[in-house]
């Protein structure tokens, strides 16, 4: 099955404020009917990068069988990690980067890799806040979640 996932993350007062993620999952079933699902969640204290990662994780974890996925994100952090093979280098170096510095958000990178594992995923960058309807909707989902009253604890903020 072919699936399209759109994602966005947001943080207020990055890195010490609340944040949220928004995800849209879209697919067309065997009868030609399009199905769209939306996901969002908010955290009390987090970072924008963590919310960008969570948006991708939630979309991939929602899939119940192996799929061919096109995942759109306005986060170059997420897209370049895969398309420019940053992750391969980080893993080879024991989750270190550059000057032997630890990679941030390792907990979420590992979770994203596990969620991606059973799928054929293509990561595509889309310019944020540029009128792309699904990206704009994900932004609304993310910011609404960040501003909501039912925020979870993000136990690892780096």
Swiss-Prot record:
Give the source's domain of life in one word: Bacteria
Question: What range(s) does the RNase H type-1 domain occupy?
Answer: 1-147
Q: How does it assemble?
A: Monomer.
Query: What protein is this chain from?
Result: Ribonuclease H
| Species of origin | Lachnoclostridium phytofermentans (strain ATCC 700394 / DSM 18823 / ISDg)
Q: Which UniProt keywords apply?
A: Cytoplasm, Endonuclease, Hydrolase, Magnesium, Metal-binding, Nuclease
* GO function term, MF aspect, one: magnesium ion binding
Per UniProt, the cofactor note for this protein states: Binds 1 Mg(2+) ion per subunit. May bind a second metal ion at a regulatory site, or after substrate binding.
Pfam families noted in UniProt: RNase_H
The record's Gene Ontology biological-process terms are: DNA replication, removal of RNA primer
Subcellular localization(s) per the UniProt record: Cytoplasm
The UniProt entry's coiled-coil ranges are none
Q: Which residues bind Mg(2+) 2?
A: 8, 139
Q: Which family would the database say this protein is a member of?
A: Belongs to the RNase H family.
Q: What EC number(s) would the UniProt record show? A: 3.1.26.4
- Required co-factor? Mg(2+)
* Residues spanning the signal sequence: none
One Gene Ontology CC term in the entry: cytoplasm
Reported function: Endonuclease that specifically degrades the RNA of RNA-DNA hybrids.
PROSITE patterns linked: RNASE_H_1
Reactions catalysed, semicolon-separated, are: Endonucleolytic cleavage to 5'-phosphomonoester
Q: Which residues bind Mg(2+) 1?
A: 8, 52, 74
């Amino acid at each position: 099955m072919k699936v399209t996932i759109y994602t966005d993350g947001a943080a207020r007062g990055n890195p010490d404020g609340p944040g949220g993620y928004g995800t849209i999952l879209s697919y067309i079933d065997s009868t030609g009917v399009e199905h769209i699902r939306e996901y969002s969640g908010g955290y009390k204290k987090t970072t924008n990068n963590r919310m960008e990662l969570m948006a991708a994780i939630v979309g991939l974890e929602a899939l119940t069988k192996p799929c061919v996925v096109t995942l759109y994100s306005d986060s170059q952090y997420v897209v370049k990690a895969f398309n420019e093979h940053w992750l391969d280098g980080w893993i080879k170096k024991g989750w270190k980067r550059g000057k032997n510095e630890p990679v941030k958000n390792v907990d979420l990178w590992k979770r994203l890799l596990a969620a991606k594992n059973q799928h054929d995923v293509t990561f595509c960058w889309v310019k944020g806040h540029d009128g792309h309807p699904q990206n704009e909707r994900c932004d609304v989902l993310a910011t609404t979640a960040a501003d909501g009253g039912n925020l979870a604890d993000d136990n690892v903020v780096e």
